[in-house]
Curated annotation (Swiss-Prot):
Enzyme Commission identifier(s): 4.3.1.18
Protein family according to the UniProt entry: Belongs to the serine/threonine dehydratase family. DsdA subfamily.
Broad enzyme group: lyase
PANTHER family for the chain: D-SERINE DEHYDRATASE, THREONINE DEHYDRATASE, MITOCHONDRIAL-RELATED
Species per Swiss-Prot/TrEMBL record: Bacillus cereus (strain AH187)
Name of this protein: Probable D-serine dehydratase
Keyword set includes Lipid metabolism: no
Cofactor(s) essential for the protein: pyridoxal 5'-phosphate
CDD domains: D-Ser-dehyd
UniProt KW Lyase keyword: yes
GO terms, biological process: D-serine catabolic process; isoleucine biosynthetic process
Lineage: Bacteria, Bacillati, Bacillota, Bacilli, Bacillales
Length: 443
C-alpha cells in the first residue's frame, strides 16, 4: 500500500477524513449510464431473475410470516413524505432543501426490520431453492408453500448456513434460515447490539461473539464454512446474490413513486441517500435504481466519520486493499450496522462508475437527527439509519455536484429519498436511550 503521506498528497480530503471531520466527496469516476453499464459484471437480467425468484417464494413467505399476508408474501416497506422533518432540517442547518423529501422505511420491513430483509432473506431463499430442486423436493412450477412441512425442515436440517455480521444481516439470515429448518450460525462483531444477539438466540440461532470488528467476524464465518462441505457461507463482502436481492427494491420503489404521482426524468431528478457499511445494501439498491432511471437518479452513500471505509476505498482507488485502521481511524461508532473498516471490493468496483458521491456524518449528528425525526414525524429509527437524512442538506449546501451536473435549474422539481435502513425491531428501552442521547446533544 502507498505510504499515508503519499496518499495525502494525492487526496487532500484524506486529512479531514483522518481527523474524523464530516466530509462531502463527489465521485470523479462517475460515468454516463450507457458507458457504465457496458462494463458492469451484473445486468438487468440478473435483477429480473432475483425478482422472479422472490415471487415464486411469496406463497411460502405469506404462510410462515403472517405479517406479510397483506402484501401476499412480498416483503416491502412504505415510502412516506416527511414535510415536517424537511422544515426542521432547513431551519437547523439554515439551508433550503430544493425539492420534496421522502423517507423509504426499510426500518419497517417485515420479518427482520431492516434493509437486510431484502438481500439476506433473498440469498437464503435462493440457496434453499437450489438444494430443494437438486434433491427433487420441489419444481419451479410448484406452490412453494409446500416447503413449510416437517419433511422439508428435516431435509434442510442436514445443512447449515453461516454469516458474519454487525447485527442486521445476522438477523435476516438467522430468522429466515431457522424458519426453513437450517442449522444457522451468526458470527457477530464486538459492536453488535445485545438485543440483536438475544433475539437471534430466541429463534434457535447459534450466535458466536468476537471482541474484534466486523472483518474478523466475517473471516471466522468463512473459515467455519470452509471446513464443512454442508455449510453455506453468506459472504457479505463478495456476494452477488445479496447485492441482487437489494437491487429488487428499485422496481418496487418505482411503483410507489408512480402511486404518489412523482415523476422522475431529466427535468425531475431523483436523489437517493443510502447508509453504507461494507456496501452490499446501498450498492444493490443504487444499482437497481440506475438500471431504471439511468442518468436521472443520483445516488450518494452515507458513512459514519469513524468508519468511512467505502469513501476511502473509492477515493484512493484501493477499494478493499485499504481499511480505515490503516490511516489511523478507529472504526468505533454507535451506528453498528455501518461499523465496517474495510469495504467490499466487489461493490466498490461495481458501483464506481454509477455512484454520484459519498459523505460522512458524526455519531452526534445521527442522534440529533434521530430525535428530530421522532419529534417531527413520530418515526423512530436506529442511529445508523439516520445517516442518509443529512444528505439533501449536504448536496444543496455543497452545490459543486449540482453545478457540475447542471441540475440547479431542475432542483425545485426534484425529489430526495432518504433510505431509512433499520429500527422497528429495536426494543423500546433501547430506542428511549437513543432518544435521550439525542436530547442531551441538542441542548
Amino acid at each position: 500500500m502507498k505510504g499515508i503521506e503519499k496518499l495525502k498528497e494525492g487526496y487532500p480530503l484524506l486529512n479531514k477524513l483522518i481527523a474524523t471531520e464530516e466530509v462531502f466527496w463527489v465521485n470523479p469516476n462517475m460515468e454516463k449510464y450507457e458507458t457504465a453499464i457496458k462494463d458492469s459484471p451484473l445486468s438487468e437480467e440478473n435483477v429480473k431473475d432475483a425478482e422472479e425468484r422472490l415471487k415464486r417464494f411469496a406463497s411460502y413467505i405469506a404462510k410462515v410470516f403472517p405479517e406479510t399476508k397483506e402484501t401476499k408474501g412480498i416483503i416491502e416497506s412504505p415510502l412516506l413524505k416527511i414535510p415536517s422533518m424537511k422544515q426542521a432540517l432547513e431551519k437547523h442547518y439554515k439551508q433550503p432543501i430544493l425539492g420534496e423529501l421522502l423517507l423509504k422505511c426499510d426500518s419497517h420491513l417485515p420479518i427482520s426490520g431492516s434493509i437486510k430483509a431484502r438481500g439476506g432473506i433473498y440469498e437464503v431463499l435462493k440457496h434453499a431453492e437450489q438444494l430443494a430442486l437438486q434433491h427433487g423436493m420441489l419444481t419451479e412450477e410448484d406452490d412453494y408453500s409446500i416447503l413449510d412441512s416437517d419433511t422439508c425442515r428435516e431435509f434442510f436440517a442436514k445443512y447449515s448456513i453461516a454469516v458474519g455480521s454487525t447485527g442486521n444481516l445476522g438477523l435476516s439470515i438467522g430468522i429466515m434460515s431457522a424458519k426453513l429448518g437450517f442449522n444457522v450460525t451468526v458470527h457477530m462483531s464486538a459492536d453488535a447490539k445485545q438485543w440483536k444477539k438475544d433475539l437471534l438466540r430466541s429463534k434457535g440461532v447459534n450466535v458466536i461473539e468476537y471482541e474484534a470488528d466486523y472483518s474478523k467476524a466475517v473471516k471466522e464465518g468463512r473459515q467455519q464454512a470452509d471446513t464443512d462441505p454442508s455449510c453455506y457461507f453468506v459472504d457479505d463482502e463478495n456476494s452477488h446474490d445479496l447485492f441482487l436481492g437489494y437491487a429488487v427494491a428499485a422496481s418496487r420503489l418505482q411503483k410507489q413513486l408512480e402511486e404518489l404521482e412523482i415523476v422522475v426524468d431529466e427535468e425531475h431528478p431523483l436523489f437517493v441517500y443510502l447508509p453504507c457499511g461494507v456496501g452490499g445494501g446501498p450498492g444493490g439498491v443504487a444499482f437497481g435504481l440506475k438500471l431504471l432511471y439511468k442518468d436521472n437518479v443520483h445516488c450518494f452513500f452515507a458513512e459514519p466519520t469513524h468508519s468511512p471505509c467505502m469513501l476511502l476505498g473509492l477515493m484512493t482507488g484501493l477499494h478493499d486493499k485499504i481499511a480505515v485502521q490503516d490511516i489511523g481511524i478507529d472504526n468505533v461508532t454507535d451506528a453498528d450496522g455501518l461499523a465496517v473498516g474495510r469495504p467490499s471490493g466487489f461493490v466498490g468496483k461495481t458501483m464506481e462508475p454509477f455512484l454520484s458521491g459519498n459523505y460522512t456524518v458524526s455519531d452526534e449528528e445521527l442522534y440529533r437527527l434521530l430525535k428530530e425525526l421522532a419529534d417531527t414525524e413520530n418515526i423512530y429509527l436506529e442511529p445508523s439509519a439516520l445517516a442518509g437524512m443529512i444528505g439533501p442538506v449536504k448536496v444543496c449546501k455543497e452545490d459543486a455536484y449540482l453545478q457540475e451536473q447542471q441540475l440547479m435549474k431542475e432542483m425545485k422539481k426534484g425529489t430526495h429519498i432518504v433510505w431509512g435502513t433499520g429500527g422497528s425491531m429495536v426494543p423500546e428501552d433501547v430506542i428511549n436511550g437513543y432518544y435521550k442521547t439525542g436530547e442531551r446533544l441538542t441542548i
